[in-house]
């Protein structure tokens, strides 16, 4: 059994259908009651926390007034903001220093090990050590359980284990990125139920804690030697470099550089179906993450529709073959607010959004959809992913819902309008096929009766024959023809106008997974288990067949191509183009499991990725092609190229690491350090050392010789209290800076036996060769307010030291100015991923940025472009008419997009066209979605050269923001303005 069949569990047994329905109704009632009770409990808990905070505020003010009598006021050089009384339900006294914070685990295997919990020290001890280590000269600003006088009432809310009145709290484990990412990639009903509209109680407590903590400003000590930031109530000390005369004079602005999406590597075929089509323009349309890709395989160009806010799960083509409807799942933004599932109808030529349908209507996600054919695509039918799999019919141009009805509690795999009968809709799925009659605002159902034919476990797909009959393919490998009766079979004993089985055809070994009706009336079928594509004539006799090679996986989608070609989407995320005579050619491919490892070549346009699927892939970033791939013995997690570019080191989950030849992909060397996940591999600038950061809290050092082909153990850095997350080398190979899952910033003296440098201020002026550590004076401004320390997965500084790219847990890629040494720094923010962004890396010449998605398995290539300073509404068109590499000084158009009112549930952002005509007037469509202050960023058609002849390109710069607006990082929604007519 393939696909959905493998992930569904039919465990309900009952004497009759009515009995089953009664039991389900009772269970649903109980679940609803429990949800109501939980909601009440959450509200009560929030009220208790609010009252407790108010009480402590009162006690603090009393103590402050008593302690201030007869005492001089403290020095005012230590700024500290107070917690306001606004939004009291979200306030909570910060007890985080009494909470044991488990290490952030980046992968599910690490989450199961429990190693971080075993090796952690109690947080109170860690704080005590941190304070004694860095605050000897300024004890007055040390975090203390006692109230602080004057302008520092916030300190009252912080309690440490030393406090006599402190009450120990339960250990709260910090969530891993995998836990915080959207669970949209799991197929079971249980996993879908994880997406709740109301945050669970365990999530409520840290969220309220974060609300209190985020008001803590960065503290600078009296002498101006170091500053402190707070993470979950814990102080993190960073020493100020000597070349900073006055910290207050530092200004952090938006970088002039911006990103535009150039290429999306990968395809989502693993858990989707019928999602590959060829448009009349010659482009293949498919999706990966939240991006819908229009790929011209002959010219090797891509265009991208970027309107979606989360995973795209299905698509349908309008009868005019120009307009497209795509449906997405529900998501959650960084503040825990739900992002509603919806359908977007858009123009594949202009990339402009025509309509947004179903906000607030669909639950969990959109499972399948289809345009009507008999009335030229006026209507759209949609099945959502709720328990009831609601069927809705829409006049999509008017955004009007015509009818709505529950279909079944079983999974629904397909929905289609009848091509000639505008009032007939067919749905199929697990153990059923339903024929719906749509009349005005009502839908009536007639169930397909299998009668003497064996009832399949799944009706997988359906199509229509030229005479109006319905053709279905099922999990038994059988095709059934359903014909509509015009007269009663037996007068008075049977209904007329119903569909009955008229013929059965054995088509495949295993399931019939997809059906494709061709323009000439012939039929293509795709098998699951046998991986065969069969061509059937007009009488449904098999004519030709071809088998998809096993390495590509099973068939998920089949579509007609040009001439005698056809397109195939597979379960291993390949899109193949083939013919029965010549076989298959790979057009699109990607990883098939969670992706973390990324490295860019030191002087070539190459990038390497490794993932849990055990694939190591080398990609050409200029030609957008795969150079080679190799299957290694274990899942890969991190990688780094030797400075010579001849070899690359791959770290795995088990502590083993491999060295591969970058040209031949041959195995050069293999080593093992510990038995836990390796999180970072980093060569020194001259390639003579390799540092290996592990989840066993150690950094292993190797001497490297023979251009990266020989390794000998040099030493081990011991001192971190949690697993290693990031590390960087100094230019002279003498020092290493490292971060851990416990928010530590440690420095190591390599020549003197890899010793920990106790006086960290000695390292404040080191000019690090690379900057990938997420904690440090030069980069701490990238952290959002109220962060729990797990929100940023990766950071990288450009080689020219102008910008920092950041990968976060909320599907966003950020671009900051470097250095970024002020809290709440503004950034450009970009959306394309639909899972936590796991890694970022600049190419060798800083022309591009590469980002990787975790569970969405995508690789996104962004082009860095300079923003031109233009007066508002003034446009400059690129007059380049020949195909040439896109310059970083491409013409841009500047426009300010008003921030939508926060009361709107979903910000309907206009999808901006990648190209404009000679009269570039922007069309702004509002999205109904709550977002942060947004910057519009137009996506040009991504290709190896510039646009088609005569089509000027443009870029829309972001809005400049004030210091007040910079409190929340700017949201840079990729949007495509439609061209003016």
Swiss-Prot record:
Modified residues (Phosphoserine): 7, 13, 16, 61, 134, 144, 146, 171, 200, 891, 895, 903, 978, 981
Marked site positions, Breakpoint for translocation to form the EML4-ALK fusion protein (variant 1): 496-497
Compositionally biased tracts (Polar residues): 881-893, 916-931
Modified residues (Phosphothreonine): 96, 201, 237, 490, 609, 897, 899
Molecular function, one GO term: alpha-tubulin binding
Keyword annotations from UniProtKB, A to Z: Acetylation, Cell cycle, Cell division, Chromosomal rearrangement, Coiled coil, Cytoplasm, Cytoskeleton, Microtubule, Mitosis, Phosphoprotein, Repeat, WD repeat
SUPFAM superfamilies tied to this protein: Quinoprotein alcohol dehydrogenase-like, WD40 repeat-like
Gene Ontology CC: one annotated term: cilium
Compartment(s) of residence: Cytoplasm, Cytoskeleton; Cytoplasm; Cytoplasm, Cytoskeleton, Spindle; Cytoplasm, Cytoskeleton, Microtubule organizing center
Name assigned to this protein: Echinoderm microtubule-associated protein-like 4
Gene name, Swiss-Prot/TrEMBL: EML4
